[in-house]
């Protein structure tokens, strides 16, 4: 849209006329300058305004131009206003500087057809240009690796919805296991997609985490998040699940019981520890305050291998290990005393006994546990069995006094006789864990009645930090804490 054309008549307003004169006078001189330079000609411009004031312009020297003008006697073109107006009206060159006829400005049927064709081609080009960017996304596919957790993933809410992780829910869209295949031999707790599918836990008692709270896919199936061990790597996670009526027992070291399994296990030696434990299933412990999870600790990844070996549907009261043997080989049946004796272990591969009813029916993939249990391996089978091809001094009697043993991994073991389970008691608040504790040491049974009786005072003889991991293919890949089996054939 061009500028509005004014009517070429005398301007009546004095002020407007003066402004228009100043602007157009300069424009005229500018055009004269351009013409003189472009066409190599001499121009002399003489202007008298309405008050007889002189304004002149000369491309070179006014006197020379005027002298040449006066001495010129040849026929030449001379025009006045009437000539210009007549030329403009006749040739319909309105607004054109030159009165000469120019066929390019005349719209003939041929030129109109040519312009229409140009416009159509331009419209087609613009239409194709707009559609082209939209085509590649329609046929484009890219594998995306979504981190399992984010620094803001560990948010603790009421006991009914224990852990809420937006990144975990976001990873549910990645069903292809090839997108989520992590490295196997790293020391990060990356779990390969070979982990079998585990249906959610069934029981929920006393306001514990139910199966509808959070379900995380691990490439081949889903498992509920229970005891708060969240894998912060970009891989499908093998999370130790603790149901409402299940165990949160931790094997590594003896220590005073955390309040109903509702405290955080913070190891000051492991600044990258992140552990959150659900409150007691019996309703005796109020939910954790979110202030208990400091930002510096909540944003750190796990640095300790954690395996949660789950048991099928344990009752909320009574002997907590009663249903344990049903998930494993009957050749290695375990009693509650045997399992209780496992508490004295100090080993790099911790064993957290949780509960999810589906693990008794599926394989624990060897590849899925190599990167979780540092140096520890669970042989694959329909029932969880133990590879006993090395000399591990792990024989224990439930009623024997405490005695020191040395495992192949160099960690000192202590056995503790287990008293009969006392009645459930209200948990007591506990300060931060001591330095020598392992990252998963703060786990306790969510619904167990061993809350206050199966742990000793904080240990001072934990003289070795938790080993992050050994090569999965080494000779010493079996961790003594993978399973404490009652086998009299194993000599001490």
UniProtKB/Swiss-Prot annotation:
Composition-biased stretches (Polar residues): 209-227, 382-394
Stretches for region Disordered: 183-227, 242-270, 382-492
Keyword annotations of the record: Acetylation, Activator, Apoptosis, Developmental protein, Differentiation, DNA-binding, Isopeptide bond, Neurogenesis, Nucleus, Phosphoprotein, Transcription, Transcription regulation, Ubl conjugation
Location in the cell: Nucleus
Domain MADS-box: residue ranges: 3-57
GO cellular component assignments: chromatin; cytosol; nucleoplasm; nucleus; transcription regulator complex
Residues where N6-acetyllysine is found: 249, 395
Annotated crosslink Glycyl lysine isopeptide (Lys-Gly) (interchain with G-Cter in SUMO) location: 395
DNA-binding interval(s): 58-86
Regions of compositional bias (Basic and acidic residues) in chain numbering: 452-462, 473-492
Biased composition (Low complexity): 438-451
Annotated positions for site Cleavage: 176-177, 213-214, 451-452
One Gene Ontology term from the biological process aspect of the record: positive regulation of cardiac muscle hypertrophy
Post-translational modification Phosphoserine, affected residues: 59, 98, 235, 255, 347, 400, 438
List of residues that carry Phosphothreonine: 304, 311, 407
Modifications made to the protein after synthesis: Constitutive phosphorylation on Ser-400 promotes Lys-395 sumoylation thus preventing acetylation at this site. Dephosphorylation on Ser-400 by PPP3CA upon neuron depolarization promotes a switch from sumoylation to acetylation on residue Lys-395 leading to inhibition of dendrite claw differentiation. Phosphorylation on Thr-304 and Thr-311 are the main sites involved in p38 MAPK signaling and activate transcription. Phosphorylated on these sites by MAPK14/p38alpha and MAPK11/p38beta, but not by MAPK13/p38delta nor by MAPK12/p38gamma.
One Gene Ontology molecular-function label: chromatin binding
Classification via Gene3D superfamilies: Transcription factor, MADS-box
Compositionally biased residues, Pro residues: 417-430
Top-level lineage group: Eukaryota
UniProt region (Required for interaction with MAPKs), positions on chain: 266-283
Function: Transcriptional activator which binds specifically to the MEF2 element, 5'-YTA[AT](4)TAR-3', found in numerous muscle-specific genes. Also involved in the activation of numerous growth factor- and stress-induced genes. Mediates cellular functions not only in skeletal and cardiac muscle development, but also in neuronal differentiation and survival. Plays diverse roles in the control of cell growth, survival and apoptosis via p38 MAPK signaling in muscle-specific and/or growth factor-related transcription.
Oligomer and partners: Binds DNA as a homo- or heterodimer. Dimerizes with MEF2D. Interacts with HDAC7. Interacts with PIAS1; the interaction enhances sumoylation. Interacts with HDAC4, HDAC9 and SLC2A4RG. Interacts (via the N-terminal) with MAPK7; the interaction results in the phosphorylation and transcriptional activity of MEF2A.
Protein name according to UniProt: Myocyte-specific enhancer factor 2A
Designated gene of the protein: MEF2A
